[in-house]
């Protein structure tokens, strides 16, 4: 099968969407399929075979993210020459619209993965800040109506999306490459940041944006450290809130107990998961919470707010705890796991076992079956 992927975010930009595309593309190619990616260009990007880059501009609100200018005199000729079987778009914006136009022009099936609750990200779009969340949901629903299949990562997101579109919606979680977690250096994190063996490491990993609710985690940690001074909170990643979060940590008097690593290499990220004792996650907007799945693969129990996709990534009381958005409850669950080493070890074992259900290989096979069914429906509809 020959698959065209259109995305508004791709390497070297880092995000859950980019990681999802990387992992899925690798697995599809391992299964013998040909994958071609259409994405924005970034300064100093690495040229890759099968990746077509489009001129782009940095966004005013977050310069690290580039918005593609979806214009190319060669795009239709390129799509024709590639002889694609299906087009798969990963956002409803500039590259997503280009993918739709190409699918329409060449009569190809169009698949859309709904990675993000777009209504929760309006504050990043200066041209759309006045749009209400209801309007954004309707607009994204209208894009779904143009597609032949909409893929979502969890059942709770399916229920939300299905209310706003007539298109078939199917649940296929983003798979995680468990092989990455086989050979890890569990001591790397402590060596890198000079953390003693007695100190417990709390970890958060992700883009530091307002919607990730990292300020909540800092407020919680300020309570945790009162009882457990021999802990450290490591925050991996960068984003528009990086500086304000650093300032908040210092204002709260925990600046010396919180380590902001900035962006790390993939190997360093894996070793960070492997070297931590507990993963913390407070986002209210995740469609899946890919980092929660990665934490599982490292055998790392998590405490997370029970919201949207995160609620389906953690089995409450088995491989972690889900809480309400209440600081006292969240703090209580962290303290419970820090107090009880045996409970934490058992949850770590459970997390590792349950990670088998979200392997990237099995999810890629499920995606291929969805492609095949969509292509078949499209062909049948054409002859009716």
Per-range role (PLM):
Residues 1-55, 362-368, 372, 382-383:
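N-terminal subdomain of nucleotide-sugar transferases
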Residues 301-304:
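Short hydrophobic beta-strand element within catalytic cores of glycosyltransferases
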Residues 52-55, 133, 137-186, 261:
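Donor nucleotide-sugar binding/catalytic pocket of nucleotide-sugar-dependent glycosyltransferases
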Residues 79, 144, 261-264, 271-276:
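Short alpha-helical donor nucleotide-sugar binding micro-motif in glycosyltransferases
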Residues 284:
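Aromatic "clamp/platform" in nucleotide-sugar-dependent glycosyltransferases that forms part
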Residues 316-317, 321-327, 336-342:
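Conserved acidic donor-binding segment of nucleotide-sugar-dependent glycosyltransferases
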């Amino acid at each position: 099968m020959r698959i065209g992927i259109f995305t508004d975010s791709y390497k070297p930009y880092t995000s859950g969407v980019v990681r999802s595309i990387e992992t899925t593309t690798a697995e599809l190619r391992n299964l013998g399929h040909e994958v071609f990616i259409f994405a924005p260009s970034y300064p100093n990007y690495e040229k890759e075979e099968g990746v077509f880059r489009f001129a782009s501009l940095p966004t005013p609100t977050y310069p690290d993210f580039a918005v593609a200018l979806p214009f190319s005199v060669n795009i239709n000729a390129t799509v024709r020459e590639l002889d694609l079987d299906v087009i798969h778009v990963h956002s409803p914006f500039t590259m997503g619209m280009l993918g739709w136009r190409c699918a329409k022009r060449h009569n190809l099936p169009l698949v859309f993965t709904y990675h993000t609750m777009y209504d929760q990200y309006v504050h990043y779009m200066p041209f759309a800040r006045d749009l209400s969340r209801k309007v954004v949901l309707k607009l994204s629903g209208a894009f779904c109506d143009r597609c032949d299949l909409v893929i979502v990562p969890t059942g709770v997101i399916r229920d939300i999306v299905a209310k706003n579109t007539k298109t078939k919606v199917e649940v296929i979680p983003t798979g995680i490459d468990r092989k990455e977690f086989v050979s890890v250096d569990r001591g790397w994190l402590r060596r890198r940041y000079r953390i003693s063996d007695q100190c417990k490491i709390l970890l958060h990993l992700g883009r530091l944006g307002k919607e990730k609710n990292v300020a909540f985690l800092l407020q919680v940690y300020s309570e945790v450290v009162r009882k457990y001074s021999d802990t450290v909170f490591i925050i991996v990643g960068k984003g528009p809130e990086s500086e304000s979060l650093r300032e908040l940590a210092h204002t709260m008097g925990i600046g010396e107990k919180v380590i902001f690593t900035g962006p790390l290499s993939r190997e360093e990220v894996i070793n960070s998961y492997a070297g931590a004792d507990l993963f913390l996650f407070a986002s209210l907007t995740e469609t899946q919470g890919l980092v929660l799945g990665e934490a599982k693969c490292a055998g790392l129990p998590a405490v997370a707010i029970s919201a949207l996709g995160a609620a389906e990534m953690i089995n409450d009381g088995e491989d972690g705890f889900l809480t309400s958005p209440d600081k006292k409850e969240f703090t209580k669950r962290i303290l419970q796991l820090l107090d009880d080493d045996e409970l934490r070890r058992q949850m770590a074992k459970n997390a590792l076992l349950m990670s088998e259900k979200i392997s990237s290989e099995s999810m890629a096979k499920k995606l291929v079956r969805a492609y095949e069914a969509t292509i078949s429906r499209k062909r049948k509809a054409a002859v009716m």
